[in-house]
Amino acid sequence: RIWGFVLALFLLGPGLLVNAVLKAYWGRARPTAVTEFGGEANFTPFYQISDQCAKNCSFVSGEGSGSMTLAISALVILEFFRDRLSPATYRAGQGLTLLMLLFVGFQRVAAGGHFLSDVLLAWTFTALIAAVLAKPLLLRDSPPPAPVA
């Protein structure tokens, strides 16, 4: 089930939603391509579909979505092996996962490849897809929550 979740998340997040739909049709130019940073394209806010980019556009960040997918996958796998790990190893795994996620996002913005909103929304969309996939793929055999008294 875990590997099905990981595969589905990679296919639906970075694969389908980000690269096949948003980056292909949103048309938002990358920071290095807009006039404010020496390029020739006009800046457009993240919520506006544009014609300022023809292919491999800025919205949303593929690396941001991929790094969030990797982070969620790592956390799910860590949770699966939690009873076999020491508490320190488990926390270290969580911390390293968070550092990787933040590093990738910061690197994409610092390099001029994406606006901060591109990265934050890629993380958000990917997390939402993971939340939708979790119930049928990860939580289906979980016991129901205890009633609140």
Which stretches of residues belong to each language-model region?
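Interfacial segments of alpha-helical transmembrane regions
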Residues: 1-24, 90, 94
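Membrane-embedded catalytic cores of phosphoryl/pyrophosphoryl-handling enzymes
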Residues: 43-149
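Basic side chains
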Residues: 23, 28-30, 108
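Short, well-ordered alpha-helical segments in soluble proteins
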Residues: 16, 26-29, 78
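Membrane-interface interhelical connector segments
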Residues: 27-53
